[in-house]
């Protein structure tokens, strides 16, 4: 089975994902739980994670130059902290090099370089930065992590994660 999103691209993964979530839902029901309760159990056991994407649009030729300059600046001056958490690893997929907090540089084993930067923080967070290949924008993918002490603590964990995301955005100047 497969689906097309109307642009000629065939998407098989979404159909597979629907089948898997249906199987998980059936398992949860057989065990007297809802999908939501199962998700809360996962958060309590493994931690809470929140992802947020920021698209910074820079139209025109000057915008393309700004985006290029932003990438060059992040590459030359990687952040030391993001949202109050120390950056412990920086990855540059264009140069295929990664640098740890002590300044040790090692190679990234990938067949093809890509204009992507990633920063990993001490508290388990991650920020990926890349220019769009089709639009005049630079994209920031922010992931923050935290603990969730109980099934009923979701609202608190989510609010704390949102605060972390805002702090990371401030650190990045976006």
Residue ranges of each PLM-predicted region?
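Short glycine/serine- and small hydrophobic-enriched flexible loop segments
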Residues: 19-27
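Catalytic-core signal marking the mid-to-C-terminal active-site face
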Residues: 31-174
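A conserved active-site cap/scaffold subdomain adjacent to cofactor or substrate pockets
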Residues: 13-20, 34
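Single conserved hydrophobic/aromatic residue that forms the stacking wall/gate
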Residues: 1-11
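Active-site loop ensemble at the mouth of alpha/beta enzyme cores that anchors a bound cofactor
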Residues: 9-15, 74
């Amino acid at each position: 089975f497969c689906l097309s999103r109307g642009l000629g691209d065939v998407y098989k993964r979404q159909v597979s994902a629907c089948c898997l979530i249906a199987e998980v839902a059936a398992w949860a029901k057989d065990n007297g739980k809802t999908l939501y309760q199962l998700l809360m159990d996962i958060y309590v056991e493994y931690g809470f994670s929140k992802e947020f994407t920021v698209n910074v649009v820079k139209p025109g030729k000057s915008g393309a130059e700004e985006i290029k300059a932003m990438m060059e600046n992040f590459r030359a001056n990687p952040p030391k902290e993001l949202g109050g958490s120390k950056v412990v690893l920086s990855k540059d997929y264009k140069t295929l090099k990664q640098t740890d907090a002590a300044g040790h540089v090692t190679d990234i084993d990938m067949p093809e370089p890509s204009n992507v930067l990633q920063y990993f923080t001490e508290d388990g967070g991650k920020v990926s930065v890349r220019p769009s290949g089709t639009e005049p924008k630079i994209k920031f993918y922010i992931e923050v992590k935290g603990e969730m002490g109980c099934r009923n603590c979701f609202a608190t964990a989510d609010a704390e994660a949102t605060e972390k995301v805002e702090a990371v955005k401030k650190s990045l100047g976006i």
